[in-house]
């Protein structure tokens, strides 16, 4: 029984480590904003598809909007 617990814990740890790795290529800081909706409009305005984005008002950068584009996600100008 003890061996099964270690196997289960090991499996859960591996799963958590695999799925917690970010595939984001980094922030593209665009414009200034105070809300998530403003940030989404800014990301859209720069040709980045918000369905593949994480738009975050980033206050420590002077209210800049972080348009986070994931690797492999097409830009809105690209044909899928």
Swiss-Prot record:
One of its GO terms (cellular component) is extracellular region. InterPro entries: DEFL (IPR010851). Coiled coil: none annotated. Its main location: secreted. One of its GO terms (biological process) is killing of cells of another organism. Residues 1-24 form the signal peptide. Keywords: Antimicrobial, Disulfide bond, Fungicide, Plant defense, Secreted, Signal. Transmembrane segments: none annotated. This is Defensin-like protein 276. It comes from Arabidopsis thaliana.
């Amino acid at each position: 029984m003890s061996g099964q617990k270690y196997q289960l814990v090991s499996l859960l740890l591996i799963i958590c480590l695999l799925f917690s790795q970010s595939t984001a290529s980094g922030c593209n800081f665009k414009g200034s904003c105070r809300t998530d909706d403003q940030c989404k409009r800014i990301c859209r305005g720069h040709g980045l598809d918000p369905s593949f984005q994480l738009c975050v008002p980033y206050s420590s950068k002077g209210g800049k909007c972080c348009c986070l584009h994931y690797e492999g996600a097409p830009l809105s100008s690209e044909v899928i």
